[in-house]
From Swiss-Prot:
UniProt GO cellular component terms: cytosol
Alphabetical UniProt keywords: Cell cycle, Cell division, GTP-binding, Magnesium, Metal-binding, Nucleotide-binding, Septation
Gene name of the encoded protein: engB
InterPro entries: G_ENGB_dom, GTP-bd, GTP-bd_ribosome_bio_YsxC, P-loop_NTPase
Name this polypeptide is given: Probable GTP-binding protein EngB
Domain (EngB-type G) ranges: 30-204
CDD domains: YihA_EngB
């Protein structure tokens, strides 16, 4: 018997809801939210677009263009949130400080936030931003799942070795509460694993397909 993951259908129905420059502009703090975070150019927008089978999140050759909290509705009570990208050198310092202030406010106050999916470029994992996010997740007991993106840029063996190395580093520094996988948007590698995490956090059960 086949099993259908209900999150797939919801993600395919994802629609842009609103953009917020600060927490006060966010949707009502109810239901379920999963936030997507990542350093600039880590493939965050591409991952979101792959999971939703759409071009919801803006991709750009200039990293760091996401300047707002962007909310996408899956249904009446479930949302995906595209958080501002960080770390791009050409973004003015005052703007970076503005992003950080409101990102911290969102992460620290949002009751409906069920987990954070953190994108790391598999070729350059565990940046200072990544470690900051891991520290926050540990301190707040927030579930975190890591996508090692752009896995198609490495050979299968090199990707596996990086996965094992990052897993070991995270286990030593942040415990067993963080899960991690390889991901490639163009190859759709790891998509099903990511869907399972989303379904679990959003409390959706797999349904048998008759």
């Amino acid at each position: 018997m086949q099993v259908k993951n209900p999150i797939l259908g919801l993600c395919q129905k994802a629609k842009f809801a609103l953009s917020a420059a600060k927490v006060e502009q966010c949707p009502d703090d109810q239901g379920y939210e999963v936030a997507f975070a990542g350093r600039s150019n880590a493939g965050k927008s591409s991952a979101l677009n792959t999971l939703t089978h759409a071009s919801l999140a803006r991709t750009s050759k200039t990293p760091g263009r996401t300047q707002l909290l962007n909310f996408f509705s899956l249904d009446d009570e479930r949302r995906l949130v595209d958080l501002p990208g960080y770390g791009y050198a050409k973004v003015p310092i005052p703007l970076k400080q503005h992003w950080q202030k409101h990102l911290e406010a969102y992460l620290g106050s949002r009751e409906c936030l069920r987990g954070v999916i953190l994108m790391m470029d598999v070729r350059h994992p565990m940046t200072d931003f990544d470690k900051m996010m891991l520290d926050w997740a540990k301190a707040s007991s927030m579930p975190m799942h890591i996508l090692l993106t752009k896995a198609d840029k490495l050979t299968h063996g090199a990707g596996k070795n990086t996965l094992l190395k990052v897993q070991s580093e995270i286990r030593k520094g942040w415990g067993d509460g963080v899960t991690i996988q390889l991901f490639s948007a163009p190859k759709r590698l790891g998509v099903e694993d990511a869907y399972r995490v989303l379904a679990d956090w959003m409390e959706l059960e797999d349904k048998p397909v008759v």
